[in-house]
Design a protein with these regions (language model features):
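Acidic, proline/glycine-enriched N-terminal capping motif
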Residues: 13-14
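Ser/Thr-rich, low-complexity intrinsically disordered terminal regions
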Residues: 2-7, 17-163
Length: 163
């Protein structure tokens, strides 16, 4: 009886793994948890994940309690977002832009962890500052799990080269 139960569990696990491989890792997570892109992040509302699986970076004064600050830039908002978008795509082959590009001062990307393809979303936004420079805001969040091991913060730090 015990052997039959163990064999049944092994077969079930094998079937789940085979389905995961056949359907594809990214699509499997999508079927389990829904689309990773849940729309734009509202930086003004400053809502964060209730679990430690996100990271927030902003130029001084643009958001409350960022994980780290990023310096304002001299470029116009649209150019700053375009530069950051190109840098992100160049550094992360799994990242793809998912926003409709109607607002050139905003961008949204979905990317995936290399091995298991866990989905993360990255939101970028730029705003003109009173001094003529452009302030930057970035929010990255894992769609699945309650922790990301600091990966989203690392991703933003690399994007803004703060290390």
């Amino acid at each position: 009886m015990l052997k039959t139960i163990i064999l049944g569990v092994i077969i079930l696990i094998g079937a789940v793994i085979a389905a995961f491989i056949l359907v594809g890792r990214e699509r499997s997570w999508e079927l389990i948890a829904g689309l990773p892109d849940r729309g734009p992040h509202d930086f003004d509302a400053n809502r964060r994940s209730p679990t430690p699986n996100d990271a927030l970076a902003c130029s001084p004064g643009l958001c409350a309690k960022p994980d780290f600050e990023i310096a304002p830039v001299e470029e116009a908002p649209a150019l700053a977002i375009e530069r950051l978008s190109l840098r992100l795509i160049a550094s992360d082959p799994l990242a793809r832009r998912v926003d409709n590009r109607k607002d050139p001062a905003k961008a949204r990307f979905v990317t995936y962890s290399p091995l298991m393809r866990f989905p993360d979303v990255i939101h970028l936004q730029a705003r003109p500052l009173p001094d003529g420079r452009t302030g930057l805001m970035a929010y990255a969040r894992a769609q699945l799990g309650t922790g990301d091991g600091g990966k989203n913060r690392e991703r933003l730090e690399a994007l803004f080269k703060t290390r």
